C-alpha cells in the first residue's frame, strides 16, 4: 500500500521560521493566520492583502506592490498563488522587493478542491513551483 504524507501549511511555516528575519512582508496575508508564529522572529512585520481587514497594513494588488526594490529580508506567501491571475508576475514581484540574501517562503496547493476566493486558477506541483520561481529570479 502506498502512503502519502501530507504536510500542512502550519508545519511548513514552522520549518520556515529558521529563515525569517528582519523586515518581513506577509503577502496575501488575509486573516494573518500565521502572524503569531512569524512576527516574533522579525524586526518589522507588514501584512498586505487585496482586501482591507484588521491588521492589514497595505491594501493592494500583489502583482504590483507599492514597495521599492529590495525592501524586505523575508517575504512569506501562504496559499495565495492559486488565486492570482498571473502567478509568474507575483513571483517576479517577490524577487524585486526581496533584499539580496533575503528569503521568499511560499506555500501553494496541489491536491485541494476548488475554492474560489474570489477565483481559483492554478495548482502547483513541487517541480512547477520551483520552475516558476527559478524563471522569475
Briefly describe each language-model feature range:
Residues 1-3, 116-119:
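Active-site rim elements
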Residues 15-118, 125-130:
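Conserved SAM-binding loop
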Residues 131-137:
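Substrate-binding/catalytic lobe of Class I Rossmann-like enzymes that use SAM or dcSAM, i.e.
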Residues 3-7, 85, 123:
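Conserved phosphate-coordination/catalytic loops
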Residues 1-18:
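Class I SAM-dependent methyltransferase Rossmann-like catalytic core
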